[in-house]
């Protein structure tokens, strides 16, 4: 029987990422053979990972990485927020973003086949991480955007890495691109422009806005406050030339009824039309980057601000950890039973 020294245990831990006791047991079982011990731990890790495969991993981190003209944002999930702060987990997230930015895969399958600096594939790295960290660790998704040599990439993470954003801006500089990414992190746009919104989606969101106004009006009526008007439109996509012409005509009729002299109408109408556009593009303001009020200059929309500095937003991607993942809501009894079963099976 080979002597299992502290030096051997340390070496195996460094190679495998296993805990002290797991490393020592593996060396004992393989009579001190380092290669066999590594393989044994890998096999045990795969078995442990398989047992954890049906668990829901909704915590985690995003990772962002810029490689030349390419930027990547990734989401990696763990089961608990505690593990998401683990140094090994953070290193895995950052390495994932880097290898994806460099490899430019077309989909998750291609991403998982990429080779990490350690020599293992991304898929193998996640199996091993699940085994060594003790929770289900899963690679969920990624996005890539590319720029030309004349454009600028902005990469930004917020809330300790729970939100990750990448963006491309034409004109301006890298600092402007980062500011745009900061805006995206805070304001949660889902698309660049109203032209990307589905017509039915706009109608549904407008109905929700009017329902909220209806509820508000019920409260206002109880305290004798005037009712708020319902919205006829929610997006620029609904504002045809005929709608704009009719709005201008209504404003002119209003000014005439108020007795305002026609010679000053040209000074009043633009402001009222701006108000009309603001009131009738609420869906755009919620979901489209260009229509949102810019957090760095709240006197302008993002589009207006970028125009003022001869710049233009080209593309972006925003990930927030756990969005769209349905967490299991187990009762206390079920949770205890599941924990005991897991302990017996490990």
Swiss-Prot record:
The keyword Cytoplasm applies. Keywords: Cytoplasm, Elongation factor, Protein biosynthesis. It is found in: Cytoplasm. The keyword Isomerase does not apply. Belongs to the EF-Ts family. Associates with the EF-Tu.GDP complex and induces the exchange of GDP to GTP. It remains bound to the aminoacyl-tRNA.EF-Tu.GTP complex up to the GTP hydrolysis stage on the ribosome. Residues 80-83 are annotated as: Involved in Mg(2+) ion dislocation from EF-Tu. SUPFAM superfamilies: Elongation factor Ts (EF-Ts), dimerisation domain (SSF54713), UBA-like (SSF46934). InterPro entries: EF-Ts_dimer_sf, Transl_elong_EFTs/EF1B, Transl_elong_EFTs/EF1B_dimer, Transl_elong_Ts_CS, UBA-like_sf. This is Elongation factor Ts. GO terms for cellular component: cytoplasm. It comes from Streptococcus pyogenes serotype M18 (strain MGAS8232). One of its GO terms (molecular function) is translation elongation factor activity. Coiled coil: none annotated. HAMAP family: EF_Ts (MF_00050). NCBIfam families: tsf. Pfam families: EF_TS. It comes from the Bacteria. PROSITE patterns: EF_TS_1 (PS01126), EF_TS_2 (PS01127).
């Amino acid at each position: 029987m080979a002597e299992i020294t502290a030096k051997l245990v340390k070496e195996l831990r460094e190679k495998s990422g296993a805990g002290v006791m797991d490393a020592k047991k593996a060396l004992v079982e393989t009579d001190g053979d380092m290669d066999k011990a590594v393989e044994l731990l890998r096999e045990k890790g795969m078995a442990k990972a398989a047992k954890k495969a049906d668990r829901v991993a909704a915590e985690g981190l995003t990772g962002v990485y810029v490689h030349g003209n390419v930027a990547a944002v990734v989401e990696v999930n763990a089961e608990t927020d505690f593990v998401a702060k683990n140094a090994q987990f953070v290193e895995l997230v950052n390495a994932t973003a880097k290898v994806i930015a460099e490899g430019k895969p077309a989909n998750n399958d291609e991403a998982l086949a990429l080779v990490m600096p350690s020599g293992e594939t991304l898929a193998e790295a996640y199996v091993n991480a699940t085994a060594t960290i003790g929770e289900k660790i899963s690679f969920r998704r990624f996005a890539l955007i590319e720029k030309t040599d004349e454009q600028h990439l902005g990469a930004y993470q917020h809330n300790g890495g729970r939100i990750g954003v990448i963006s491309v801006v034409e004109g301006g500089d890298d600092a402007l691109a980062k500011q745009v990414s900061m805006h995206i992190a805070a304001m949660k746009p889902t698309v660049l422009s109203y032209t990307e919104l589905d017509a039915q989606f706009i109608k549904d969101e407008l109905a929700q806005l009017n329902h909220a106004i209806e509820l508000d009006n019920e409260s206002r009526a109880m305290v004798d406050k005037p009712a708020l008007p319902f919205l006829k439109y929610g997006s620029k996509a609904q504002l045809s030339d005929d709608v704009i012409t009719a709005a201008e005509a209504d404003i002119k009729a209003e000014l005439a009824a108020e007795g305002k002299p026609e010679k000053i109408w040209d000074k009043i109408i633009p402001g009222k039309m701006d108000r009309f556009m603001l009131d009738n593009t609420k869906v755009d303001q919620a979901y489209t980057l260009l229509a949102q009020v810019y957090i760095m200059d709240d006197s302008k929309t993002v589009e207006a601000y970028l125009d003022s500095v001869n710049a233009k937003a080209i593309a972006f991607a925003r990930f927030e950890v756990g969005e769209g993942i349905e967490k299991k809501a187990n009762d206390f009894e079920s949770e205890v039973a599941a924990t005991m079963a897991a302990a017996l099976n490990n």
